[in-house]
């Protein structure tokens, strides 16, 4: 499992240590990368199978990753989180109204890192319009400082990445 290359490139924006929330973590490739760097990671996903794989690899390397099964479509789910030094969302389109709740869980000077599809790729029929990250989705975090925004391509896939600072 290889972590997201742009996360590695962007780690300079993150606090040097602390607690990070990985939303919709899947198998946890980014969680594992961050834990290897010494961060305390809280990883959330709706798939028990994916979290079991993440737990297996984390235990194998004795990494500090807390996993949680959760449905992000449940209205109150995000209200019961810790406070974090950074939150990452990779290849998952969060409902726009949830960003304001999420920002309450980022510590002062903390980071929100969002990476997602900018357009539907021609080589992956599983990605639909519902998966595309839109500027208007982020309207509730406009008052925070946008540290960096980048559009990039890997093969036929185009992505957009945002780094917000609270």
Question: For each predicted feature, which ranges?
Answer:
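Conserved SAM-binding strand-loop segment of SAM-dependent methyltransferases
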Residues: 61-73
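A short SAM/SAH-binding and catalytic strip from SAM-dependent methyltransferases
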Residues: 85-98
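A short acidic, Gly/Pro-enriched loop at the edge of an enzyme's catalytic core
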Residues: 77-86
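Conserved SAM-binding motif I beta-strand of class I
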Residues: 40-45
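Conserved SAM/SAH-binding beta-strand->alpha-helix loop
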Residues: 47-49
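S-adenosyl-L-methionine
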Residues: 1-15
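A short glycine-rich, Lys/Arg-flanked "PGG" loop and its adjoining helix->strand segment in the class I
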Residues: 99-110
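Conserved beta-strand signature within the Rossmann-like core of class I S-adenosyl-L-methionine
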Residues: 109-119
């Amino acid at each position: 499992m290889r972590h997201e290359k742009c996360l590695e490139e962007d780690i300079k924006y993150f606090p040097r240590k602390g607690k990070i929330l990985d939303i919709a973590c899947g198998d946890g490739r980014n969680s594992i990368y961050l834990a290897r760097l010494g961060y305390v990671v809280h990883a959330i996903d709706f798939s028990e199978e994916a979290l079991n794989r993440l737990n297996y690899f984390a235990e194998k390397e004795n990494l500090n990753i807390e996993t949680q099964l959760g449905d992000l479509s449940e209205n109150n789910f995000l209200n019961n989180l810790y406070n974090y030094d950074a939150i990452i969302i990779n290849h998952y389109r969060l409902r726009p109204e949830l960003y304001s709740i999420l920002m309450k869980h980022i510590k002062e000077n903390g980071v929100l890192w969002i990476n997602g599809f900018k357009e539907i790729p021609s080589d992956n029929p599983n990605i639909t319009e519902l998966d595309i990250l839109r500027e208007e989705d982020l309207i509730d975090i406009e008052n925070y400082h946008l540290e960096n925004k980048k559009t990039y391509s890997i093969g036929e896939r185009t992505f957009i990445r945002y780094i917000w600072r609270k």
